[in-house]
């Protein structure tokens, strides 16, 4: 198996070769992953918002952004600058502390969740042993911020939006966790790196989507609900409750909610790609590609090329799912709140439990095919 590139080890060794002590080299490395994570997530949001505008324009037979830079690529930057310079209004009868903390509590857990996302064998900020459940734990903090924002606004529509967000998150976190548990059962690990490694070696046929089709659908539906994307955007339904918990917000506080929403969408798409679509794994096994090219899998140049293409493969799979999510937003009608809760509690939860039991039975009956 291609072991990939040890990014941290290579960086520290390079600094030590320059005469920098090991302790200093490690201290220099420590903030770099967080900085790279912030830059990567921000660029990802810019791309996702541009895609949103272009795909929505295509669905409505419009051209979409085209004047701000080539193909309108600078529109997300212009939107961000507009929000930065807008006045930050705090309602007179609101709770200013909770009103300010709400959007911050929403955004921080989403960015922290990128710590466990691997883009390659050793290209991961923190290979935590319980990485997937760390993400679920962090995502459960978000509804607190949304409820806080809705309550602090002193607005009935904001409060309704916050309550809807909390109810929706609780309803779909359990099916999401059950789908993840089935994957962990097959992989014998909760580490995202181990889960991808368990899928590698057989190309597209080894991906978990074939062994867990029901789990894939549960995870994808629950992830869309957690991201509050149509048809599950009940907490901010314009026709019913103006803008939900965002009603009284303006300026960058308003922008933080949208930033959190898009970063969450990208994060969820990355995790679907990692858990079910092989992550950085190629559709064709690497040993076959190396054989066709007449090179060894251990060749350093081949490893660098495959590691680089592996990052591209992970991002491509994720943005393919982002495209599907955006397309769903502009083609599927919104469900009612009772339908939303019924889907979570009365359908996805029992189906997730049955899927988990079925996975356990198949793992016992066919250990080689289901993780050993």
UniProtKB/Swiss-Prot annotation:
<keyword id="KW-0521">NADP</keyword>
<keyword id="KW-0874">Quinone</keyword>
<keyword id="KW-1278">Translocase</keyword>
<comment type="function">
    <text>NDH-1 shuttles electrons from an unknown electron donor, via FMN and iron-sulfur (Fe-S) centers, to quinones in the respiratory and/or the photosynthetic chain. The immediate electron acceptor for the enzyme in this species is believed to be plastoquinone. Couples the redox reaction to proton translocation, and thus conserves the redox energy in a proton gradient.</text>
</comment>
<keyword id="KW-1133">Transmembrane helix</keyword>
<feature type="transmembrane region" description="Helical">
    <location>
        <begin position="128"/>
        <end position="148"/>
    </location>
</feature>
<keyword id="KW-0618">Plastoquinone</keyword>
<dbReference type="GO" id="GO:0031676">
    <property type="term" value="C:plasma membrane-derived thylakoid membrane"/>
</dbReference>
<feature type="transmembrane region" description="Helical">
    <location>
        <begin position="204"/>
        <end position="224"/>
    </location>
</feature>
<keyword id="KW-0472">Membrane</keyword>
<feature type="transmembrane region" description="Helical">
    <location>
        <begin position="308"/>
        <end position="328"/>
    </location>
</feature>
<keyword id="KW-0812">Transmembrane</keyword>
<feature type="transmembrane region" description="Helical">
    <location>
        <begin position="351"/>
        <end position="371"/>
    </location>
</feature>
<protein>
    <recommendedName>
        <fullName>NAD(P)H-quinone oxidoreductase subunit 1</fullName>
        <ecNumber>7.1.1.-</ecNumber>
    </recommendedName>
</protein>
<keyword id="KW-0520">NAD</keyword>
<dbReference type="GO" id="GO:0003954">
    <property type="term" value="F:NADH dehydrogenase activity"/>
</dbReference>
<comment type="similarity">
    <text>Belongs to the complex I subunit 1 family.</text>
</comment>
<feature type="transmembrane region" description="Helical">
    <location>
        <begin position="97"/>
        <end position="117"/>
    </location>
</feature>
<comment type="subunit">
    <text>NDH-1 is composed of at least 11 different subunits.</text>
</comment>
<dbReference type="InterPro" id="IPR018086">
    <property type="entry name" value="NADH_UbQ_OxRdtase_su1_CS"/>
</dbReference>
<dbReference type="InterPro" id="IPR001694">
    <property type="entry name" value="NADH_UbQ_OxRdtase_su1/FPO"/>
</dbReference>
<feature type="transmembrane region" description="Helical">
    <location>
        <begin position="249"/>
        <end position="269"/>
    </location>
</feature>
<feature type="transmembrane region" description="Helical">
    <location>
        <begin position="166"/>
        <end position="186"/>
    </location>
</feature>
<dbReference type="GO" id="GO:0016655">
    <property type="term" value="F:oxidoreductase activity, acting on NAD(P)H, quinone or similar compound as acceptor"/>
</dbReference>
<feature type="transmembrane region" description="Helical">
    <location>
        <begin position="27"/>
        <end position="47"/>
    </location>
</feature>
<dbReference type="Pfam" id="PF00146">
    <property type="entry name" value="NADHdh"/>
</dbReference>
<dbReference type="GO" id="GO:0009060">
    <property type="term" value="P:aerobic respiration"/>
</dbReference>
<dbReference type="GO" id="GO:0048038">
    <property type="term" value="F:quinone binding"/>
</dbReference>
<keyword id="KW-0793">Thylakoid</keyword>
<dbReference type="GO" id="GO:0019684">
    <property type="term" value="P:photosynthesis, light reaction"/>
</dbReference>
